[in-house]
Amino acid sequence: RRRAMDNLAHAMPHLSEGERHDLAVRSLESMFQLFMVESVATPRLVTPTSWTSHVTFAPSHPLLQRALGLLLERRPVILCTGHCGNWELLGFVMTMLGFDMTALARPLDNPWLNRWILGVREARGLRILTKWGATEVVQDILDRRGRVGFIADQNAGDDGLFVPFFNRLASTYKSIPLLALRYEIPVVCGYA
């Protein structure tokens, strides 16, 4: 909660302390509901015949048409999302629809919870790589014209690339742009 309050103070200094507190509480509640409740329900509710009841899809949007075109071309692509919307649903639905996907993830600190969420993530075929030491595996996937997904809004630590974000510098992964440049491949950003 302290981290959320500190981040909100930097990002939204115009809000009062009480407004920031309320926003932090609502945000944490939403994250919990999204992660725990929706992740439990997703494999049961979102199926090849019911997914359109749970996912809004705008195939006529020009950017989405371009992204789908890249995915259908069977060429290597880097996909990025953040901790916004329902990132778990995004990977689940993409693999359920037949897109071959591998995603990088940080293991959860709780081993039981980590095993459970891996089962949910892999239920429809999403392959999960532990983000630490995955460089060679990611390069092999891209060499084979595969797709790799990143949740790009995580702290990359002291070795990351520092970029301006809500009035201060934040560390993000250098690997995403470096891989895109090395392989001359597109980076597709989106959310669910």
Regions found by a protein language model. Give the residues of each.
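Membrane-anchoring hydrophobic helices of lipid-metabolizing enzymes
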Residues: 1-81, 114-119, 123-125
